[in-house]
């Protein structure tokens, strides 16, 4: 699983001209699922995101987590995080899990964040979305479960 985390002062998703979700201070989380990902990976990444110290404390150091600041999360599925551009000019998405595998894991990721106490909004799975954000910092962090866990669940 891959998550592109962006610390935001606000973010929103619009589908067909209708605002479907928005948050204030928190994180925009673009989530990609690959073949072989599982529920444990989704839960592990949600815990990682909720506890990452990416917000400044009184001294200006990144020392506070999403939970510490009472921030929200906007979770948006994005299979294109698994684009392979090594050959040719058109990206291949063969590594991305099909929708019937990806959707439950994106849902598990969002539900785990909620269970941890993070207010969560979501995009619309599979829809063409207009995603707006004000990146705070900017702080943008790439989380890849295969890299973070050495390819295993350890």
From Swiss-Prot:
SUPFAM superfamilies, per the entry: DTD-like
GO terms, molecular function: D-tyrosyl-tRNA(Tyr) deacylase activity; Gly-tRNA(Ala) deacylase activity; Ser(Gly)-tRNA(Ala) hydrolase activity; tRNA binding
The name this protein goes by in its record: D-aminoacyl-tRNA deacylase
Pfam family, one: Tyr_Deacylase
Keyword line: Cytoplasm, Hydrolase, RNA-binding, tRNA-binding
Top EC group: hydrolase
Subunit-structure text: Homodimer.
């Amino acid at each position: 699983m891959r998550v592109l985390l962006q610390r935001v002062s606000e973010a929103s998703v619009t589908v067909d001209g209708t605002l479907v979700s928005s948050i204030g201070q928190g994180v925009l989380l673009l989530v990609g699922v690959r073949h072989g990902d599982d529920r444990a990976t989704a839960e592990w990444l949600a815990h990682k995101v909720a506890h990452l110290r990416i917000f400044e404390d009184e001294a200006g150091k990144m020392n506070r987590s999403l939970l510490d600041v009472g921030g929200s999360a906007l979770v948006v599925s994005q299979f294109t995080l698994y684009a392979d551009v090594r050959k040719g000019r058109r990206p291949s998405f063969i590594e991305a899990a099909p929708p019937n595998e990806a959707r439950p894991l994106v849902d598990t990721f969002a539900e785990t964040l909620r269970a941890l106490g993070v207010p969560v909004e979501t995009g619309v799975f599979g829809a063409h979305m207009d995603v707006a954000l004000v990146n705070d910092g900017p702080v943008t962090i790439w989380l890849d479960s295969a890299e973070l866990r050495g390819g295993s669940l350890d």
